């Protein structure tokens, strides 16, 4: 067969002719797929166009197109019927049984059942599926339309129940194909970014919730301000603690805490309870943060808490500490005062320094006697006596403490005018111990040597109380013997003390004679003086001086011509009724009378 040379030359450039029937069929399938892609894009604009699905049949023979042979530089879209394998090793496989063959993909974990897979071939007008670009017409015509409709209905219901499964499988199956790689990867990244943002937002919400909880815990912890517990010594804690008693049984520690908050910040408040029953014993201890709050807490004593007045006082440990401090201060004060100095109080106001010296000089040599006086040079009733020898001071203290002088019981103590609760006997015992210690330290003084006794040991002695029950007042006989400087001191044991004779005085005191509130006359004082003077002159004896003191006691002072008249007046007026009142009459020493009325001495 001879070929024309011109035909042979044009053969390589001539496009291969396709039969008319096959060409029409390909055009119809291509146009139908384009219309299906357009409708799918409008119905789901957010999803990428689905790739075509091959309907597998035993008679199907895969056909692959080569877009490079058609003169294309880039791959055409999937909608034109092209399909690209993921790798050179992947190929289409057919199953031996079943209506459709599954396509083997790398994402095997997302394999879906056969009845959930979507067929991308659109329906035809006659109820059958249109042939895909890779399938034959005969294979589609042999399938039942009813079975196709059932499969499509099941696929639509599955997509409605699982809206995300379609896109997920689509991305997994076709994300690596050339036409979908870039677009689907960007969609996947956007999806992952949204997921990460939502997870971070959830984490942020959780962190905010935890921060809110922490802030709430901090606020709740700040609702009861407390100091951070520091290591305090027991002495410091005792100084900050008060003892509270007379508390109600139903009182709680919180109520006690709030009550003492008005005195200052409270560190701790503990109610003492029974170990077995747990009931309150009515007492508590409250510890403050600062020592200044203790005095403010003591000021709350007497205020009512749950209807009961509370009693606030220092703890026993604090009381003992204050007692020790007071004793140390007393010893420091006594260290500055010689031990051979005495303090004498409750002395009659008319006695002078010479009178007191004459009374205390029989016990030993006196260096000085000094009575305290006011601005008008009147005695204040107390003073100091200093002996040369502490032994003399000891004897004077033992004998003269409590001695009755001019109607007054004198009080004698050591060193200064600060009186303690120590008795004279205990002081004398301590005095002897101190003196013995002093004599051991100075043996030369035991041989008759003189001593000034200015040692620090004597200065450390604390003053004694002048009011004590164990002291025995010196009798008048003993005092008179000492005053007379009798040499027969050994005969003191033979003397028999006689009862002290009553004080004879010309002065009398009448009490409860009147009531100033009931007197209405402007000259009632002069009138009362005249009435009492006339009655006493007539019944008891001559009155040389009388004075009415307008006070609540109703006192009238009367001085008679002699002591017998005064005693007679006291006997007759005592317990007598006068103006509806009972009179109280008593002898008044003349010294007291003259101290009160100095002009009565010349009367």
UniProtKB/Swiss-Prot annotation:
Record region (Disordered): 1-239, 435-474
Record key words, sorted: Phosphoprotein, Repeat, RNA-binding
Modified residues (Phosphotyrosine): 174
One GO-annotated biological process of the protein: mRNA cis splicing, via spliceosome
Biased composition (Basic and acidic residues): 190-204, 224-239
Keyword Transmembrane: no
GO cellular component assignments: nucleus; spliceosomal complex
UniProt protein name: RNA-binding protein rsd1
Organism: Schizosaccharomyces pombe (strain 972 / ATCC 24843)
């Amino acid at each position: 067969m001879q070929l024309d040379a011109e035909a042979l030359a044009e053969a390589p450039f001539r496009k291969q002719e396709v039969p008319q029937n096959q060409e029409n069929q390909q055009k119809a399938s291509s146009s139908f797929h384009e219309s299906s892609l357009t409708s799918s894009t409008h119905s789901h604009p957010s999803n990428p166009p689905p790739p075509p699905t091959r309907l597998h049949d035993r008679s199907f023979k895969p056909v692959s197109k080569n877009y490079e042979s058609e003169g294309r530089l880039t791959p055409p879209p999937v909608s034109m019927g092209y399909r690209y394998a993921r790798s050179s090793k992947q190929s289409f496989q057919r199953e031996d049984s079943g209506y459709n063959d599954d396509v083997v993909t790398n994402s095997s974990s997302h394999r879906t059942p056969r009845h959930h897979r979507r067929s991308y071939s659109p329906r035809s007008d006659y109820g059958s599926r249109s042939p895909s670009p890779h399938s034959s017409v005969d294979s589609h015509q042999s399938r039942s339309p009813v079975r196709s409709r059932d499969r499509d209905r099941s696929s639509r219901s599955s997509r409605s129940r699982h809206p995300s499964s379609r896109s997920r499988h689509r991305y997994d199956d076709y994300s690596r194909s050339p036409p979908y790689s870039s677009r689907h990867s960007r969609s996947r990244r956007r999806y992952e970014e949204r997921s990460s943002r939502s997870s971070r937002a959830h984490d942020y919400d959780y962190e905010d919730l935890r921060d809110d909880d922490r802030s709430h815990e901090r606020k709740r912890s700040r609702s009861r301000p407390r100091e951070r517990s520091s290591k305090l010594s027991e002495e410091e804690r005792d100084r900050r603690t008060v003892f509270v008693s007379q508390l109600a049984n139903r009182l709680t520690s919180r109520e006690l805490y709030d009550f003492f908050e008005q005195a200052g910040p409270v560190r701790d408040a503990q109610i003492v309870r029974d170990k077995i029953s747990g009931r309150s014993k009515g007492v508590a201890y409250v510890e403050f943060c600062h020592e200044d709050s203790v005095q403010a807490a003591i000021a709350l004593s007497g205020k009512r808490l749950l209807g009961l007045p509370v009693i606030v006082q220092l703890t026993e440990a604090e009381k003992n500490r204050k007692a020790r401090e007071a004793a140390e201060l007393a010893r420091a004060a006594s260290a500055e005062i010689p031990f051979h100095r005495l303090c004498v109080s409750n002395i009659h106001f008319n006695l002078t320094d010479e009178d007191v010296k004459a009374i205390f000089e029989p016990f030993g040599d006196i260096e000085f006697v000094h009575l305290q006086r006011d601005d008008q040079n009147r005695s204040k009733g107390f003073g100091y006596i200093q002996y040369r020898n502490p032994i003399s001071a000891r004897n004077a203290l033992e004998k003269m403490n409590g001695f009755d002088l001019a109607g007054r019981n004198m009080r004698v103590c050591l060193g200064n005018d600060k009186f303690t609760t120590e008795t004279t006997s205990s002081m004398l015992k301590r005095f002897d111990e101190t003196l013995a210690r002093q004599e051991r330290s100075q043996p030369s003084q035991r041989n008759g040597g003189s001593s000034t006794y200015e040692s620090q040991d004597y200065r450390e002695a604390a003053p004694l109380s002048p009011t004590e029950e164990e002291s025995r007042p010196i009798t008048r006989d003993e005092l008179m013997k000492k005053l007379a400087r009798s040499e027969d001191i050994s005969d003191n044991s033979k003397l028999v003390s006689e009862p002290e004779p009553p004080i004879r005085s010309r002065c009398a005191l009448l009490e409860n004679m009147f009531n100033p509130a009931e007197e209405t006359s402007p000259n009632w004082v002069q009138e009362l003086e005249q009435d009492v003077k006339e009655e006493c002159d007539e019944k008891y004896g001559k009155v040389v001086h009388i004075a009415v003191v307008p006070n609540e006691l109703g006192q009238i002072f009367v001085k008679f011509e002699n002591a017998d008249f005064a005693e007679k007046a006291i006997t007759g007026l005592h317990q007598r009724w006068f103006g509806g009142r009972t009179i109280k009459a008593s002898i008044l020493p003349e010294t007291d009378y003259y101290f009160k009325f100095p002009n009565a001495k010349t009367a």
